[in-house]
Structure formats: C-alpha cells, structure tokens
Amino acid sequence: MKNNFLKILYTTPILHYPPESGPSLRVENSIKALSKISNLYLYSRSSIYNIGGKRALDFYKIYYKNVYFSPLSSFYLPNVFNVFTEKIFRKKILPVRTESEEIYRDILRIADKTRANIIWLGYGNLSYPLLKYLKQNSSYKVVLDTDSVWSRFVLRGLPFAQKEKEKTKIIKAGKAKEAEEIWGAKLADVTTAVSEVDASYYRQFVRKKDQVKIFSNVIDLETYQLGSKKENNRYPSLLLSGTFWPGSPMEDAARWFIDKVWPEIKHKIPKIKLYIIGKGSDKVLNLVDEKQIIIKGQVESVLPYFFNASLMVVPLRFESGTRFKILEAGACGIPVVSTTLGAEGLKLKNNIEIEIADTVRQFASSVISLLLSKEKSQTIATNLKKIVRQNYDLRTLEHQGYEIIKSLL
C-alpha cells in the first residue's frame, strides 16, 4: 500500500512519547499509520524536551524520513488550548505561548525542501490559524485532522455550569470555536473526523461531501500485548481513566460517579476498589478521602491498570470525539460500562459489546451485574475485543489514510 513517491509533511502542536493523553495517543497512531503509506516527514511545533527528549526521538525515528523543529519550539506550546480552558474552566492547562508567522513560514520552507505533496495538520483543532496561512500563501493540499468537534465539547458543558457568568463564557467560547470550524471545513482540502457523528457535523459546511473523511481513533494492538499477565486480585476493582483539570469533563464524571454511583455499588459489593488514573487526577481529586478509592495521578504505563481491573467505567456527561479508553479496555479484555455520550461515535451494540447506562441506578446496576456474573462479563469483554480488532486497529487507520490521500492526488 505504501507509495514511495508520496511525501507527507506532518506537523503537530502536540507530540509526546509516551503518550500523556488521548490527543497525543492519536498523534502517535496517526504517525504510525501514515508512515506505512507514504514517506513521512515530521515537523514538531514543540521542543525536543517537551516531546519527551531523546527517548521520544528514538521511538519516532523508525517512522519518519526526517524530523524538524520550529525555530521557536523551545518557547512554544499551544496557546489556543489555554484560551478555551481558561475561559471555561478557569485554568490554563499549558504554558502560554503564541505561534507566529515565523513558524508558519518555516513549515512552508520545509514543505518546499522535502517536496511534500500534502501538509497534514495533526491535532487540527488547534491549527486553524496555520490552515488559513497555508491556504493563503501556498498551493499545497492541506489535511485538517480533528479529534473531536471542539465547539460541542465546549457547549456541552453548559448544563453543568453553576453561574450565569460561567454560562456566558461557555456560550461565547463555543460560538467562537463553531465559527472557526465552519470556515475551516470550507478551506481545508480535507477535514478528518473520528466518527460519522463528527463527520455529519463538518459536512454541513462543505460544498463537496468528500471534503470530510473518516480518520478514526484507533489503537496499536501490539502495544497491548505487553505485560498481559493478570495479577491474582482478591477483590474486584473498577478503573476510571482520563485527563483531569478543574471543571473538566473528567472531574465532573469522577465526582458524579463517586458521589452518586459508587455508594450503591459498595452497598452490594463492600470490598470493591476504584482506581483512578490520568494526568491531574491526583490534584483535582486530592480531597477524596476513602481507602477503597486509589487515585494514582499520571502513570508511566496504563497497561497494569487495564489488565488487572475487573471493569472500566466511563461516566462522562459532556465531551466530544471518541474514547480511547474504551478501545484500550477492549484490547486488554475487560468490559466497559459507559454513558451514551461516553461511547459516542463508536460502533458498539449495547448489552453485547458494551453496557450503556445514563442514570445513577442504571449505571450502578450495570456495574454490579457484570461484577457478579463472570459469564456475562467475559462475554461482553470478548465481544468488545473482537470489534476493536476488526474496526479500531492501525490497519483501519492505514486504509482510511490511503483513501484520504487518493482523493487528493
């Protein structure tokens, strides 16, 4: 499938090894898939230090022909992300820096130097200004690679805002992002979406429907073969995983689960444990004080937690995109209980490959039922693993990438 004459310049504001979050995992898997079908050149808008140093370079070098760093990469991390998180959640998630035309000009210089056929904007949700610059100043084909509908992510937090001032900020930020998504979809040669749910949104704004293509969230199944031996756990355990910051979807999900659902589960299964992992979880939930809730924060590897959990819970009430954690749970052979929104965009059948529950009683009942029935739990887990292997591994992404490239050449 690889086209040795095709050159892609892949540029991203978010790159890290090992992956710290869903976005960085998506970038990693995109690089792996695109390297299988093209000669890939990597342009990082973050410094060597910020992507993980020599360890990261050693990991990525097998996938790219060459790597370039922007002249300002030592000082830059995405500012746009902070604009939204500070307005909505009252917290800057990343150090504030701004991209400049100097970086954009350098990207074009490298595109010319490598004779790239396509410029691929990884984590395109942060790359709209770059998209505009490239289309105004060059004739390159540009792929805007999104991982969600960010305006939905913002606006879905509206029902959970406590104050009118906060609601006003959410509406303003959401509408601003919506406007960006509209002109961005029209301007990009291709806008990618992680699911048909997101794709149907972007297709509203384009003249030709093939300007929007699916480029799914997937996982590299080989990664999940490591350390697969399960420990002998005396008591059942639940796993809650994600990226946390004050007011984040994960904070809301964790607090709803801990305050409302957890007591009902403990009543039926008194010795159960809940493990919470992910960047910021230890800080955001630092006041949670219960021996059976173990909050680990950011961990070096999620694999021991996934492989040894009895069950994964995804109690999200607002978000956008598709959840890597569900795919990871499937790869590791554990069942999942999720809200409808948490499983959005994934082609999974309720009560067959996943358990869907949206109320406190439903969620607690689904968790208890799976924990008390090994046969049911194993069936759900096996079916989920089968779907992940069929539809959500790197081969799927390679095929989708090939179709995107074919439409542009």
Task: Explain the meaning of each model-derived region.
Residues 354-361, 369-375:
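Conserved acidic donor-binding segment of nucleotide-sugar-dependent glycosyltransferases
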Residues 74-96, 142-182:
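Acceptor-binding helix/loop patch of EC 2.4 sugar-transfer enzymes
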Residues 1-68, 114, 264-267:
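N-terminal subdomain of nucleotide-sugar transferases
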Residues 26, 214-289, 295-300, 307:
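Conserved catalytic-core segment of nucleotide-activated headgroup transferases in glycan assembly
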Residues 141, 151, 174, 182, ...:
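Donor nucleotide-sugar binding/catalytic pocket of nucleotide-sugar-dependent glycosyltransferases
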Residues 325-328, 335-339:
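Short hydrophobic beta-strand element within catalytic cores of glycosyltransferases
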Residues 189, 307-321, 332-334:
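Acidic donor-binding loop of glycosyltransferase active sites
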Residues 375-406:
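A charged, aromatic-enriched C-terminal amphipathic alpha-helix characteristic of glycosyltransferases
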